[in-house]
Amino acid sequence: MTEADPPAGNRPAGTPHAGASPAAATPAETSPAAATPADARPVGAGWILALTLGVVAVFASWFGPLQILLPAQVDLVSAPGTREGQLALIVGIGAAVSLVATPIWGLISDRIRVRLGTRMPVVYAGTAIGVVGQVVLFTADSGPAMIAGWGLVQLGFNGPFAVLAALIADRVPTAQRGIAGSMFGVGQIVGVIGGTVIAEAVGSGPLGYLVLAVLTPVLLVAIVVADRGRATAKSDGAGPRQPAAGKRAVISVRRFQPTRDYAWAWLLRFLMNLTNAILLLYLYYFLDEVVGATDVAGSVLMVTVITLILSAVCAGATGAASDRLTRRRVFALAGALSTAVGLLLLAAATTIPLVMIAAALLGLGWGLFIGVDMAIITSTLADDTTSGTLLGVANIANSLPQVVAPALAAPLVVSAAGYPALYGVGAAIAVVAALCLIPLRSVR
């Protein structure tokens, strides 16, 4: 489940969504330009762990609020009967900010990498902005203040998320991208669980924002340290660096060169993240109004933990298996179909046990998908020198669902059809996502 990214890759995402999302390919799967990291020296377990911790930090900062902190805070600042619309407005505006910020951060990181051989200044700047947003949310006592704080959180943390996704394209050999991409997905899952646990542990109150404001920078330090030795011009063996072209290169349309398969991979990521956004947006209220949970925050935590533990286990196994088999599409297909079945079951659920069964299916589906998502999306990149920009655009597929989901969900949940219609629509979207794999020819 996700972000959200973002969050970014995916994402993830997703995630990666994900931020975003946040990949491996055989020689037959990639163009020569996309395959340039193939000769990079292998990354170690420590580097992959540091990358994963960075993703955990970003997604905890996104999904602790999305799962519990924002809905609970909206209850305190909104008039009776307006909480659904107020939450949709806050989340939607934040997602719109993310939508714009994600590709811009990616483009900026590309230009910084060309000049300095590292993307880390984007991590520093984005983290600082995101922490300011968390402090604003801690003090917020009105809807506008919450919008401002959440917008800063989305704006800021999309910076490090964009860098984390791009580092896979920069540093990881193609033979390791399945496992690296799956750990990117696992980081999203652990971040969602961690953020939710933190939010529940502090009693669903605004103190959770301060805890995240301290924890997020601490976890992001790991990738800054781990990547320091590699942060030299083309130390990954990707060939000679193209010279910087100044402002003209930044705005040139020629710098953006998506392939047809990139477009299908983008749509696949978008649709899967949309199903996830539909699930998460009103989960708190669904468990309250339809299921009648006595401890709503605790029930959200229970559903989240069940879903995401299964996702994490499945994603890790899927990434390793896809590297060995050099097959990605079959895992993504199984993930989309499992998600569809889980959402259909959720549409019929009125008891906690049935919700838990649906959560297990959704966890399985999300794990299968994010285990190969990053591998699929990076195998379609057309140009190594614009990987940050292209992955930034790919991370829009993590954040755009956060804009679309409120617009789609709010009218459904207040209609006579209610939550069954919402989750039924989500199941249909998952089936359409599965169909996107048919024209995705360059990925096996």
Task: Give the role of each language-model region.
Residues 119-135, 330-345:
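Structural signature of the two symmetry-related core transmembrane helices
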Residues 120, 201-216, 411-430:
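A membrane-interface helix-boundary motif in multi-pass transporters
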Residues 101-116, 314-327:
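Helix-to-loop junctions at the C-terminal end of transmembrane segments
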Residues 81-85, 174-183, 297, 384-394:
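Loop-to-transmembrane helix entry/capping segments in MFS-fold secondary transporters
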Residues 385-415:
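A late C-terminal transmembrane helix in Major Facilitator Superfamily
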